[in-house]
Amino acid sequence: PKAAAPVGSYVATKEVGKFLFISGQISIDKDGNLIKGKLGKNFSVEEGYEAAKRCALNIITQTKKHLNGDLSKVKSCIKLTGFVNSTDDFTDQPKVINGASDTIVKIFGDAGMHTRAAVSTNSLPLGVAVEVDAIFELK
């Protein structure tokens, strides 16, 4: 996907020492459309998983852009934080955010294994279903 510009007063990436912080990447489909809605109401766990996967692909795009296309500069993924727009009774946030986690591990192998939080929220920017941010360690 194309690296999306921030929608507020912040930067998409920030390198501090050997760490690269990636701002929250929202769920956008392959055609550039926002994946909007609420888990437990408009989306199944499987659809949420796919939305989280798209967030991870956007994280990779931002990382590649920051590193001038050279993902070999990534030593490891430290942490992902996933936010799931969900109903009060929806409790499968971890299953949804597995979409992002599985994608990062698929791309980086063992170096992609990370710590994680999967958080429920009743609203996300622009009405999207999922948002994920990341922290990477660089070589």
Language-model segments: residues:
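Short, polar/acidic, helix-capping and beta-turn segments at strand->helix junctions
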Residues: 1-139
